[in-house]
Amino acid sequence: MRVVIAMDSFKGSLSSIEAGKAVAEGVRRADGAIECAVCPVADGGEGTSAALTEGLHGETVRVRVTGPLGEKVTAEYGVKGDLAILEMAQAAGLPLVPQDKRNPMKTTTYGVGEMLRDAINRGCKRFVLGIGGSATNDGGAGMLQALGFDLLDKDGNPVSFGAEGLRVLAKIENKNALPALKNCVIRAACDVTNPLCGENGCSAVFGPQKGAAPEMIREMDGYMRNYAALTKNLYPESNLDTPGAGAAGGLGFALGVFLHAELMPGIEIVMEETRLEEKIKNADFVVTGEGRLDAQTAMGKAPVGVAKLAKKYHKPVIAFAGGIEKGAEACNKAGITAFFPAVRGVTTLDEAMRPETAAENLAESAEQVFRLLTLR
């Protein structure tokens, strides 16, 4: 019997690979002859870079870059051959900004551009970039500046960091952009479809969680429209209504237009890079899961992405989760054959989330399920 194990991380407890290895341990306890293939899974959010880097046996690189408030921070990204695996949140994520200093007028994506530049200097030509969890609403302007694009005011001076820089933006030039960008293929893990501007745009929808008040939201939306109009002078094909343009405070717009990146669901990128489909083709069972299974899981999170791929080849899918919430039955309709809670008995959340406890709970649950599946 062949089993493919593609677990998402149990946030705050186990990484994707750690969760997968725990399940594999349980499966082998049930029957040591079962072949287990553990693959990393992530949906493009926090932990995607670490999961994919570990799963591909890549190298973790640490680099000092400009943080969201202009301070220096240490960012990590993965490298495997000519592939770089990055998360914008490492350089411009909301957790890097204290609650009382959250102000998207000031926060910048400059460090994201520095990460990309560092990876390019290391010889990378293919990029996977997770763009969730941003603290910014600068339309990716900071990233572009770090990559050599000139964003200038009416006097020809570089605009300042943050959305407030877009307020005085009068001209965009690409003649000094990093030449190596022409040879780069970038895929951005993007799970939102918001346009750049308007009531569903980045300022209106995501601005409040980044510290924007109603008046600031209106101002930033106006700045974004000006930015989009100036961009159209340079790139006539650009469109502020492109699905995903509003991702990460407009970073999706800059990536798609200036860097010709492809915006696609994170789970699809991860599954493609790990060649999960090839492994599933030859499997008898597929195992997936995450920390909590609920109605949101069925809306396209990693376990359902795995299940849809397995369904293509008519493979049964078993899911394990730390917690099963109301609405989880929607996962059955989305392709998960059966799901099981991994927590055994009444316990506290802190105890259940201890890595050694979570791993053993997963192993024990997997063992019991596969004892039944291997019954002769």
List the model feature ranges, each with a label.
Residues 1-131, 135-376:
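N-terminal loops that bind phosphate or other acidic moieties
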